[in-house]
Amino acid sequence: MSGAAKRVVVGMSGGVDSSVTAWLLKQQGYEVIGLFMKNWEDDDDSEYCSTRQDWLDVVSVADLIGVDVEAVNFAAEYKDRVFADFLREYSAGRTPNPDVLCNAEIKFKAFLDHAMSLGAETIATGHYARVRQNAAGRFELLKALDHTKDQSYFLHRLNQAQLSRTLFPLGEIPKTRVREIAAEIGLPNAKKKDSTGICFIGERPFRDFLNRYLPTKPGPMKTPEGKVVGEHIGLAFYTLGQRKGIGLGGSRDGNGDAWYVARKDMANNTLYVVQGHDHPWLLTPVLNASDLSWVAGEPPAAGAAMAAKTRYRQSDAACTVQAVDADALSLGFAEPQWAVTPGQSAVLYDGDICLGGGIIQ
């Protein structure tokens, strides 16, 4: 890189992916500043909160690769912009994906704004995705070359301005190679396991966590025919397609097939369950989505043949855009989709290009 080095602020979590991201950019000649985000305040002494250790890992990595690092607290922004929505969605009977909103509102908004205040031209994260500028000058979000690790689904709510200032160095690299690089350069966290759980909240038991914030009320579990087969502990604790944890594994009711959560009747506090993976109540030929966001800069045309994901790691499903306007999207699938879940994101793709999407209704 000729001339003065370009300044890039890297979101460093203490994990392997963001650590290798910082090292790669340093090798490419960037002036790298590491930024550690603390976005959750409660239960810092909990066995499930690793914030202190994550920060120590960031400091150790930064010292090894020779970059400056600082910590910033976005807990207020997270609770206001992400967690409040998370609770509203669960209260309404939907199953939200907070990682999607966290990316749009925290990692690529609050974080980006802070990075710009530090004089950075771009930011970078350890996400597995790619960005390129097309001939028309628009920026495109693409799947990672390693499709098994692709995270473009979680990034579909970014806008063109955010995308234009973002680097994803790992988008061209297989995850196995990232681990190899970490070991080769002696990163102290080279063998650290990947994080899971709710964005920034960690891996604590979800039911216990949610129960602290939402009032719950037990109610009946019914079949589509109206037969009561059990009792649920609160509708917020269940999601469509759920098989484990519904308490009917040993039930003698029905035909012996596995039970699945099929619908929630919020008005009557009733959970509907069905037997069999391919029960008609679990299959959706057409979905509607709202709260649309188009990272591509514009929506697809009605009638366009696309592919869609209705959950992370799902294989692309062939679909047609039946209708689209500023507020609503309707998708028709070539094959009915299983357990399409209100609150999750429906994300559209044209090949490897992520166009955007909306919240399933």
Curated annotation (Swiss-Prot):
Site (Interaction with tRNA): 127, 344
Keyword Disulfide bond (UniProt): yes
GO MF annotation: an example: tRNA-uridine 2-sulfurtransferase activity
Active site residues per record: 102, 199
Chain segments annotated as transmembrane: none
A GO BP entry: tRNA wobble position uridine thiolation
Region listing for Interaction with tRNA, in residue ranges: 149-151, 311-312
Binding positions (ATP): 11-18, 37, 126
Keywords from the named record: ATP-binding, Cytoplasm, Disulfide bond, Nucleotide-binding, RNA-binding, Transferase, tRNA processing, tRNA-binding
Keyword Cytoplasm: yes
EC number: 2.8.1.13
Enzymatic class: transferase
Cellular component, GO, one term: cytoplasm
Catalytic activity: S-sulfanyl-L-cysteinyl-[protein] + uridine(34) in tRNA + AH2 + ATP = 2-thiouridine(34) in tRNA + L-cysteinyl-[protein] + A + AMP + diphosphate + H(+)
Residues covered by region (Interaction with target base in tRNA): 97-99
Localization annotation: Cytoplasm
Cystine connections: 102-199
Family under the similarity heading: Belongs to the MnmA/TRMU family.
Function: Catalyzes the 2-thiolation of uridine at the wobble position (U34) of tRNA, leading to the formation of s(2)U34.
Stated name of the protein: tRNA-specific 2-thiouridylase MnmA
UniProt lineage: Bacteria, Pseudomonadati, Pseudomonadota, Betaproteobacteria, Burkholderiales
Gene: mnmA
